């Protein structure tokens, strides 16, 4: 195996043609496509905290990924017990052919310390690996913290962005357009959150609220809330755990968040 390129981008030149990616055709599906029709991605590179798998000619941004990892684990106060497997695909079709799942651009398997992604570096799915070591609340908060952590430490950019837009700017714009889904009691449960058809809006809204909680109450309070929650918590359970962790009702925190967003 030969590596070319600088410290921020590694390219693997796989000697055997048999290790090249086989890409399947077809569009996205709402469910896994069934047994994979292509071989798993080949191992391509390794860094201090990751093992990378990608096709010949593809690349990952190792320096940026390691910088993000170093920042995030300190911020969350976690120790990751093993290297994370980073599986990078060239397209949704490629991902679907190899995993049977083609309805997303990225997903995590925290129990396997594995992420699957189309991106050359990742600051969202890796967060699911880290926070799973702490706890697993409803999807609203679980996705919210991942979005709130979408920063770029290597570039010195610590503003959380989702699909290129700063999350509080997005929340403000959605509110002005009357698009924010309110009150939050409608969507803080997993079923409520997943019931929003516009996932870009739902992720930005959750990310803005959780980023606000981190700013207002501190990361330790947020992590305390994570430790007590489960994915299937009902609304009243979430309300009680929220008040216990933050010393504030969900409704009061929502009002303060909206005042902050403007």
Can you annotate each of these PLM segments?
Residues 25-29:
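N-terminal Sec signal peptide cleavage junction
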Residues 97-104, 110-113, 133-262:
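Acidic/His/Gly-enriched intrinsically disordered linker/tail segments
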Residues 37-139, 155, 234-241:
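Juxtacatalytic substrate-recognition/specificity segment
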Residues 2-17:
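Bacterial N-terminal signal peptides that target proteins for export
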């Amino acid at each position: 195996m030969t590596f070319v390129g600088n410290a921020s981008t590694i390219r693997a030149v796989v000697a055997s043609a048999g290790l090249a990616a086989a890409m399947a055709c077809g569009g996205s599906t709402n469910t896994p496509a069934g047994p994979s029709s292509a071989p798993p991605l080949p191992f391509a590179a390794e860094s201090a905290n990751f093992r990378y798998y990608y096709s010949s000619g593809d690349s990952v941004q190792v320096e940026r990924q390691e910088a993000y990892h170093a920042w995030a684990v300190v911020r969350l106060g976690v120790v990751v017990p093993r290297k994370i497997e980073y599986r990078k695909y060239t397209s949704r079709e490629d991902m679907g052919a190899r995993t049977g799942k083609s309805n997303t651009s990225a997903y995590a398997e925290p129990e396997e310390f594995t992420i699957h992604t189309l991106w050359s570096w990742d600051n969202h799915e890796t967060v699911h690996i880290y926070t799973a070591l702490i706890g697993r609340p409803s999807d609203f908060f679980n996705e919210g913290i991942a979005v709130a952590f979408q920063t770029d430490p290597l570039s010195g950019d610590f503003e959380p962005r989702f699909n290129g837009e700063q999350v509080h700017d997005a929340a403000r714009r959605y509110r002005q357009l009357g698009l924010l889904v309110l009150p939050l009691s409608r969507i803080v449960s997993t079923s409520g959150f997943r019931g929003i058809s516009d996932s870009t809006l739902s992720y930005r809204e959750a990310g803005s609220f959780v980023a606000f909680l981190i700013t207002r109450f501190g990361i330790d309070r947020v992590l305390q809330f994570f430790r007590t929650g489960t994915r299937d918590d009902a609304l009243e359970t979430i309300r009680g755990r929220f008040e216990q962790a933050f010393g504030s009702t969900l409704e009061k925190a929502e009002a303060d968040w909206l005042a902050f967003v403007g």
